[in-house]
Amino acid sequence: MLSIKFINDNRDYVRKALENRNFDVSVFDTLLSYLDKRGAAMHDAQIKRSELSKLSRQIGSFKDDKAKMNELKLQAANLKKDVVELEKNADEFDQKAYEIIISIPNISLDSVPVGKDENDNQVINTHDNLGRKLVSNVLPHYEIGNKLDIFDFERAVKLSGSRFVVFKGAGAKLARALQNFMLDLHTANGYKEYSVPVLVKPEILFGTGQLPKFKDDLFFMEQTNMYLIPTAEVPLTNLYNNEIIDLSQPVRLTGFTECFRSEAGSGGKDMKGIIRSHQFKKVELVKITSEEDWEFEFKQMLEQAKLVLEELELPYRELQLCTGDLGFSSRTTVDLEVWLPSELKYREISSVSYMGDFQARRAMIRYRDDNNEVKFTHTMNGSGLAIDRLIAAILENYQNSDGTVSIPKKLIPYFGSDKIAY
């Protein structure tokens, strides 16, 4: 959430930044109108209060002149009514302004390329890490998975409908191996592991920016007034909701959760396989830092997410998102996309995003600086990584000509064998 002071002090800058993010600037202009009216009402109320204070002092000097005293008392009563009315108006404009402010996305860093949509994203680097030769005619992950009997889509439909998957046998084992491998990798590099609830209160999703704007993308449990989390970013960041925390060292968190998304608006995209499911597995990385530390910590988080792909020897690329493709809460985002040879294209497997103090303002996460001044923290998060898509990438990039799938070397100790066979 942007601060009112920042908006008022940088109106032209914010307007242009929102325009670059494809935000309807007429809504922003309405916000400015409400802020101006709120400011005017508060200013007028202050003038009336000053007049009332002056009048109250005068009343005492007319004790012997009841007519004059009554006249002044009447004026004072009218001034009080004016103050109450002006303060009421200010509160109404303040509420209207707030309702718009919580719908306004974050302001991108000046270094983020201006663009309309995903077509304007910029490739930073491409990493051809695969230490083996691909077989010809690579089967899609869902076909090789069915042949190896590690998925059961039919029974998933029976249980829950479309966009769900049952992992079984070596498939379930591979998912568990990846989870443990990534958590070990992250905790060895300074992240503290957490196991968190997947059901959270509405105010928790507000804190990280999913509510109210993305309500339709979430699964709501009406009987409990709670939501299933779309990512562990939500509970991990909000562990410190409404707290003043010690930031003598940056807070570094990791955790595995099931994640849930309604995929509203995705239409018929990716109906086959495990690329886009209502429920999926993911290991998340979250950091809470000071403003001074964010850049170093962001670069380190990106390297940590990349390390998973490097260790698994999977080909991938880094993509700097443009202004028009940034997430709601993000100031800058680098996507990591893994190569899927059956599709001859890269697929997102991680988004590493820096949020500034945008989420901290919504969630009221604060710290004391060296001068004991209370400030909002800065937050960042990234997938570390999405397990279902990792499985798809391994099944395609590690296929063998005999129909088996090799296991990446670093994963073998976790999986217990070097391949998945019939």
Swiss-Prot record:
EC number: 6.1.1.11
Catalysed conversion reaction: tRNA(Ser) + L-serine + ATP = L-seryl-tRNA(Ser) + AMP + diphosphate + H(+); tRNA(Sec) + L-serine + ATP = L-seryl-tRNA(Sec) + AMP + diphosphate + H(+)
Enzyme class: ligase
Gene3D superfamilies given in the database record: Bira Bifunctional Protein, Domain 2 (3.30.930.10), Serine-tRNA synthetase, tRNA binding domain (1.10.287.40)
GO cellular component: cytoplasm
Keywords: Aminoacyl-tRNA synthetase, ATP-binding, Cytoplasm, Ligase, Nucleotide-binding, Protein biosynthesis
Signal peptide location: none
Pathway: Aminoacyl-tRNA biosynthesis; selenocysteinyl-tRNA(Sec) biosynthesis; L-seryl-tRNA(Sec) from L-serine and tRNA(Sec): step 1/1
Amino-acid positions noted as binding L-serine in the UniProt annotation, renumbered to this chain: 231-233, 284, 383
Subunit structure: Homodimer. The tRNA molecule binds across the dimer.
Recorded domain comment: Consists of two distinct domains, a catalytic core and a N-terminal extension that is involved in tRNA binding.
Name this protein carries in UniProt: Serine--tRNA ligase
